[in-house]
Amino acid sequence: EERAESVDTIHKLPRVERFGDRSIEGRRYTDPGQLDLELALVFRRGWVVGCPLWQVSEPGSWSVLNETSPFSVVVTRDTNGTLHAFRNACVHRGSSIVKACGKGTALRCAYHGWSYSLDGRLREVPRAEGFGGVDPHAMRLKAVSHAVFAGMVWINLSEDPEPLATSLMGIDEDLEPYALSEMEPIQERVFSVPVNWKSMMENAFDYYHAAEVHRHTIHAHVDSAPELAILGDHMCQNLHIAPYKWRRMLDEHCS
């Protein structure tokens, strides 16, 4: 209920004021047109995380990103162990092929029954005689650029993207000591709120609220204010947590 009231307040604000000589219109956080622009200029041009690598660790497994979006992507591990990424759209009529993570020998469109091997090749066309000169061997799912880093499969929807390592602007070196590829999920929770991605991201970058909301956890073990750095198209925030106090607290509450 409290979260719903906060979201409703954002909707009603004509402007979100800040210190200095600038202000930000509240609609930037809720307007569908603004979101469409950001999707086109940011998310469909840059590298984004498609799925954790463990979801497609076994041959025959697949994972899906944005299953309800027209720009949905499916990541597969074929029977030979090779990783692939494709637009989640049947080459026949564009219907979504995958609705959820799974495992099997083929991807099958639930609309007309066209099926594909996990390497993207068209495998079966029901009543193929009605399609004249269609050559199944010449048709396949549209491939999407992908790369693996930090235990994640990254994808890029643009036609000729720069290498992931170039895009990360050195952040990959900063993250390497954390061995993210060795981490395993312990809990998954899904929240649905009527705001777009910026509200979630800005909350993560907003250390200003930590003293009030997280006073007995993170804030109690932070040595100093976070360090912010602009790296190309990215913003990096380093938060220095007192290691021994933090580790002791985790041991007491999580062991």
Protein language model annotation of sequence segments:
Residues 57, 82, 88, 147, ...:
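C-terminal catalytic domain of Rieske-type non-heme iron oxygenases
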Residues 43-47, 95, 209:
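Generic structural signal for secondary-structure transition and capping sites
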Residues 9-25, 181:
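Short, contiguous pre-domain boundary segments
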Residues 26-69, 73-74:
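Non-catalytic accessory segments flanking enzyme active sites
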Residues 55-159, 163-173:
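Rieske [2Fe-2S] iron-sulfur-binding domain
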Residues 21, 26, 31, 44-45, ...:
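Generic structural "secondary-structure junction" signal
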